[in-house]
Amino acid sequence: MQVIILPSAHDVALYAAARVIDVINTETNPVLGLATGSTPIALYKELVVLYQSKQVSFRHTTSFNLDEYIGIADSHEQSYRTFMNRHLFDAIDIIATNTHVPLAESQDAGTLKNSAQDYEASIQQAGGIDLQILGIGVNGHIGFNEPTSSFASRTRIKTLSESTVVANKRFFKDGEFQPHLALTMGIGTILDSRAVLLMATGKAKAEAVKAMIEGSLSAMCPASALQLHEAATIVLDEEAASLLALKEYYQWCEQKRQQLHEGDVS
């Protein structure tokens, strides 16, 4: 696990954007795993700027989002399809049919199970995910894989924790239906990605970040599963990294890694 600590949330977004662009420019038919929530918005803003300045094209890119609420239409203001259209897809040249968000409008269990299986199959048919972007919840969730989620789990129906429902309540109007269920990629699905980049910013994420990086491997902190991934990069701002016991060591490692990259082995 590579831990990179940067001065600010803006620096985290710039680093993540550079990684995404590198994948797009390296792979013939790049496949990205995308996330929603407040943290990736800054990343998507940077990607739009890079596209508008003609530094990148998404024409040959395929994307798969981590999750979607169950029981609301794609067109709903708070659906993750709407989120992605608003913050990224509508502003770049990605082909609409190459963008995938779990189909979760139905509330029929059988239909949702089939949708989950189809999503897994679509990822495989695309050749797997080259780079999966992640955020982290205050309880350590990734995607909507809440505490106690199996590390072997695949795309499935998941009940949201109370803390997740409360955290997302601000996005829904008073009296409006707020889903308590989601269709989400499983932890096993995420771990199948060839590379993972998790972004975390702000003091509110510091405890979850510490548990993920320095805590035990445990289903109680779903993000700790990234300890098992051979190409997981955790990019933090100073506030999110503030509780790490080995913070100075991670910074030292990154300094030495940069020297090696530049050919300096002193």
Swiss-Prot record:
InterPro entries (alphabetical): Glc/Gal-6P_isomerase, Glucosamine6P_isomerase, Glucosamine6P_isomerase_CS, NagB/RpiA_transferase-like
Keywords from the named record: Carbohydrate metabolism, Hydrolase
Keyword Plastid part of the UniProt annotation: no
UniProt KW Amino-acid biosynthesis keyword: no
Documented EC number(s): 3.5.99.6
CDD domains named in the record: GlcN6P_deaminase
Description of how the protein assembles with itself and partners: Homohexamer.
Name used for this protein in its record: Glucosamine-6-phosphate deaminase
The organism of origin for this protein: Marinomonas sp. (strain MWYL1)
